[in-house]
């Protein structure tokens, strides 16, 4: 699933009008599983001069990168953070940790069923097992067209929820402009 959809869904499920800190924790938690990729790919491409083909066909699947992805996509780690946050929810940091972790878990719950040959080790450090889904969010031979329909439905539904929840003009501008982030030139 595309990162903006993860963020929209997490915000639709977990944000609260008037609770800016909570909403930022949700937004950050929704993107943290992909942060390693967003930092690594431009570095490899523009600093190290690695070709796009080598980057996504070789280096992405090499053990160092797969380990980094496992660290950032670990259900046990975010589950532990959610439990700690829940236990400490009376304190501001506990509540923020809880919503950060819940947003990250929402991201992983929607990634798990749509990764085929590029499946993550979501249960690291307890296991290196990967769920190889019959579906993929980008590979047509694994029903990407149908996955895109579901993703679009999540996108539209989440956007409607957020449009109604947050009356601010800047929120509406982001919701209108966000689809542009999926256009690949």
How would you label these PLM feature ranges?
Residues 1-183:
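N-terminal membrane-targeting hydrophobic helices
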């Amino acid at each position: 699933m595309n990162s903006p959809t993860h963020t929209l869904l997490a915000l639709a499920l977990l944000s609260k009008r008037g609770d800016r800190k909570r909403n930022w924790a949700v937004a950050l938690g929704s993107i943290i599983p992909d942060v390693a990729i967003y930092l690594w790919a431009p570095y490899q491409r523009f600093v190290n001069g690695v070709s796009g083909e080598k980057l996504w066909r070789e280096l992405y699947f090499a053990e160092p990168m797969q380990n980094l992805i496992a660290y950032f996509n670990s259900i046990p780690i975010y589950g532990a953070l959610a439990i700690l946050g829940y236990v400490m929810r009376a304190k501001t940091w506990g509540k923020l940790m809880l919503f950060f972790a819940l947003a990250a878990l929402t991201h992983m719950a929607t990634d798990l069923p749509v990764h085929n040959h590029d499946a993550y080790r979501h249960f690291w450090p307890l296991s290196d097992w990967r769920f190889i889904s019959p579906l993929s969010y980008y590979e047509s031979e694994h029903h990407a067209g149908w996955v895109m329909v579901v993703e679009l439905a999540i996108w539209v539904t989440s956007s409607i929820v957020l449009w109604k929840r947050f009356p601010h003009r800047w929120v509406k501008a982001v919701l209108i402009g966000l689809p542009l982030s999926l256009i690949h030139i």
